[in-house]
């Protein structure tokens, strides 16, 4: 009997160890993002400071009990200073928090070995660091969508879509008002089903910022989790999750794991009489087997429940609509047409903002209260359909303060709709080419607009990992936010280059004459230097306050570039300056910007500077600028092809070197810096 009992206990111990090992294994990895916009080198001060920060966050002295802590290392105002935070899920213990943070601190250096900015998410915690201060700063980007594979049945969709947003908004308000910035809530969905929700912000946010952050991520609900029985959106500053099962640590979640009453596992009496004494032995044997087996069954049930939870998390991670670069794919951005109609009051005239590329633009309000700009493409336009798909594919991959943010899209029959962030100050041309409104644009603002556009283009060309050529940069495609910061928009013409690709050819010329580079307008060749040419024209328009097309056949001048060149060689560049800011600008900055613009519009694209070089020229007056060469491309030579006074698009026009007898060097495409 003793041997049997010991054997049973031994087996039970092994089984229990296996269960505990499963339960206490590594944290559940969700996702990580480390954009390569800024990197550090090996043995650099930044790496030393980063290791100090991660060591501090994962040290025994960190504030695991409060589930949130921050650290910094490096001198104040030093570019190598590092800031870091961790946030653990509000329902985990301090021990689980500690283990997760320690694991994440080690893992993030392996997943992001050179990037200065990174965030890594686990089911139990998040670790984030940056070269800029992040404490108290609300950020929803970069973010990740995670969805459950299973869908709600068709007859329940309408009710589910009503219940879920209301539940999440309620729990978001509850979390924002709590000191921990964490809350859970549940709501009855059907007689037999309950929706469980969890939301959380980093505790360093104000109540207002926390609620704003949660409302914004909840806004992604129709795009990330349409009809899904479970899903979540995780961002640097906040997150939400919902499921149709209790996934967080509350009494209702712990109940299935609780052991049954002790009487069910208590050994039966050992003194039952037996005629031959065998009954007693049999009872002992049964007891020796029954006790560990009963406990094992209970623990097996607990293990299955835990594994099911982990499996649900894993399924979510495996089915997320993200590409290998951590960029949200277009599959996660879709709106229902009914939601668009509701947001725009069925596309009422009072909501119309104006006309965009291939359609009209409306102001809309989503169910969470966020104001958006909704671009509705003209129905039946095959060209619009192509540009629509391209715009979604391109813009969904971009994240930069100087690019308009695509929030979603709708494709429903003939309806093709894009949903952008709402930018209150319309576009640059609305101010720049109006005699009264242009006075709002003093030189300081214009200079910041020039710099912002340059940074946005640099991101497209170099830092987005994709090398994107916009091909239609012009004043009407530069939006201005509430602080008059520029945001490049309208990516319907944009093209993505491969890693080693430096140029491309096309017979379908798209864009706007006057902003096109000669090699593109004549030969159909485009590269990053095509956008540099357009940028140069934009800079000249910002300085002069005049449209490029307004110079057509005026005093024998073909275009704005020719007019500027004439005054430049006459050593009278300040005559170009817009009268609206005369006497209120920095002379050296204006002259330098004119000089840079003339370098951008040179005929030979290989002699044009890169956007990287342009920003160096703008920010360092010690850099000597090369002497610009005259552009050989005049708008008046294209009169037979299309009257540039219309400012129209060339999207339906095909051009080759034979159709326009202008002299342009076929080999004038430069080689882009490899990345």
UniProtKB/Swiss-Prot annotation:
It catalyses: L-seryl-[protein] + ATP = O-phospho-L-seryl-[protein] + ADP + H(+); L-threonyl-[protein] + ATP = O-phospho-L-threonyl-[protein] + ADP + H(+). This is Cysteine-rich receptor-like protein kinase 25. CDD domains: Gnk2-like (cd23509), STKc_IRAK (cd14066). GO terms for cellular component: membrane. Residues 1-25 form the signal peptide. Residues 303-675 are cytoplasmic. It is found in: Membrane. The active site is at residue 472. InterPro entries: GNK2, GNK2_sf, Kinase-like_dom_sf, Prot_kinase_dom, Protein_kinase_ATP_BS, Ser-Thr/Tyr_kinase_cat_dom, Ser/Thr_kinase_AS. Residues 638-661 are annotated as: Disordered. It comes from Arabidopsis thaliana.
